[in-house]
Amino acid sequence: MSTIAVIDYDMGNLHSVCKGLEKAGATPKITDSSIEIDKADAVILPGVGSFDPAVQHLRTRNLEIPIKQVIASGKPFLGICLGLQILFESSEEGQEPGLGIFAGKVCRFKSEPGLTIPQMGWNKLQFTQPEHLLWSEIGSQPWVYFVHSYYVDPTDSQVTAATVTHGHQTVTAAVGKDNLIAVQFHPEKSSTAGLKILSNFVSKVIPKNLALAS
């Protein structure tokens, strides 16, 4: 059974993520310890809230370097919601530099007549990396749950693993590269499709990346 470090930096409720992981057969461990993060089979960086406080909390807990080391080591890593955004270089929402794992920035949805910002509720994913193991056996264009006013805009469009269309704006909803995958939506709130995504991370993504790293 895989042990997954769920990083705690005071940015959101971690327990719903942990429940989803337990249903998928993993053992989640909420932690802000670099030692526990290093020992885990995989790492999840969740998050709800604003960009600047998130990166400030990570840095005051001395978690920036351990996160970068884990990703560089090849260990499976999943970012969720704000945990996706802070992997980028900067955000229109704040002044703090992000972690810079991905080149690009975080942008706010542009206003449109009749468009609600934040996007809050269910929307369809369009896969741009349909062969990614995270999407295995889910079917095309699954409905997943979003709550966000900002989206990531990668410099390299090849890292985009899925998109979502809100109003007339089609934006990145997930990125994937090597051992790193991160999603804007909340799999833990996305019913059957979301639980399957977490299950795929546990049963397919983790074993593959651990095998490659060994």
UniProtKB/Swiss-Prot annotation:
Boundaries of every Glutamine amidotransferase type-1 domain copy: 3-211
InterPro entries per record: Class_I_gatase-like (IPR029062), GATASE (IPR017926), Imidazole-glycPsynth_HisH (IPR010139)
Subcellular locations according to the entry: Cytoplasm
Keyword Cytoplasm: yes
Any one GO molecular-function label of the UniProt entry: imidazoleglycerol-phosphate synthase activity
Function: IGPS catalyzes the conversion of PRFAR and glutamine to IGP, AICAR and glutamate. The HisH subunit catalyzes the hydrolysis of glutamine to glutamate and ammonia as part of the synthesis of IGP and AICAR. The resulting ammonia molecule is channeled to the active site of HisF.
Subunit composition and interactions: Heterodimer of HisH and HisF.
The name this protein goes by in its record: Imidazole glycerol phosphate synthase subunit HisH
Taxonomic placement: Bacteria, Bacillati, Cyanobacteriota, Cyanophyceae, Oscillatoriophycideae
Gene: hisH
